[in-house]
């Protein structure tokens, strides 16, 4: 089974992935951040490095999806291949940070990859406001994120909302503004109750 966590930068995807992996005994797949050779350069000069970064993520995410499809374990994934192609790359293009040539090349490659993979069994989307995202980003203190532009973050959030309205797979939405799953056990239980209902309830997903 493939469970995926989606959400903007700072939404709490990695935290929730770790907590759910521990709670259910699922195998976690985390977003490759610490060893990413492009990330610091990208935040310093987005126009120069946007295509390189997005191809790096697309490659890693596609590899993850292929591995997940072959696994007999239940995998919970921190961020998905769909977010790269439907959120981040188009946002960079619209902001003038990725050329039309690079964007078209990227999109063609993603469409080919998408024809070879299936949707996750359950997509969990963490919805957060901009102030909440900024608070989380400041708390975790990654140097390369501190120079992030607010309009960049806002553009991503708007794209997430448009994308999630058109998503065709099994979907569960967590309100990240009102649900403190990290520090409030009752809030975390509410999240797991929702998951239990969808995966193991009387009328589970088909």
Feature roles, as predicted:
Residues 8:
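P-loop (Walker A) phosphate-binding loop of NTP-binding proteins
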Residues 13:
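Conserved lysine of the Walker
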Residues 18, 22-60:
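Conserved substrate/cofactor phosphate-moiety recognition/catalytic segment
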Residues 5:
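Hydrophobic anchor at the beta1->P-loop junction of P-loop NTPases
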Residues 134-206:
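NTP-dependent small-molecule kinase module
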Residues 1-2:
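Pre-Walker A (Motif I) flank of P-loop NTPase domains
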Residues 87-159:
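A glycine- and Lys/Arg-enriched "phosphate-lid" helix/loop adjacent to the NTP-binding pocket
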Residues 49, 53-118:
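Glycine-rich phosphate-binding loop used to anchor ATP phosphates in small-molecule kinases
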């Amino acid at each position: 089974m493939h469970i995926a966590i989606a959400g903007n930068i700072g939404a709490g995807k990695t935290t929730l992935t770790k907590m759910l992996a521990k709670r259910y005994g699922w195998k976690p797949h985390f977003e490759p951040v610490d060893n990413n050779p492009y990330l610091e350069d990208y935040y310093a000069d987005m126009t120069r490095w946007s295509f390189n970064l997005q191809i790096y993520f697309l490659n890693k995410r596609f590899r993850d999806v292929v591995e997940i499809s072959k696994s007999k374990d239940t995998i919970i994934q921190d961020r998905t291949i769909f977010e790269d192609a439907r959120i981040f790359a188009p946002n960079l293009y619209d902001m003038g940070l990725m050329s039309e040539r690079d964007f078209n090349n990227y999109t063609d490659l993603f469409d080919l990859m998408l024809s070879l993979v299936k949707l996750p069994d359950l997509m969990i989307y963490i919805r957060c406001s901009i102030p909440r995202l900024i608070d989380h980003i400041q708390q975790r203190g990654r140097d390369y994120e501190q120079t992030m532009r607010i309009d960049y973050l806002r553009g991503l959030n708007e794209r997430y909302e448009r994308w999630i309205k058109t998503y065709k797979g099994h979907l569960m939405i967590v309100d990240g503004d009102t649900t403190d799953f990290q520090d409030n056990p009752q809030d975390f239980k509410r999240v797991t109750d929702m998951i239990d209902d969808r995966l193991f309830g009387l009328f589970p997903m088909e």
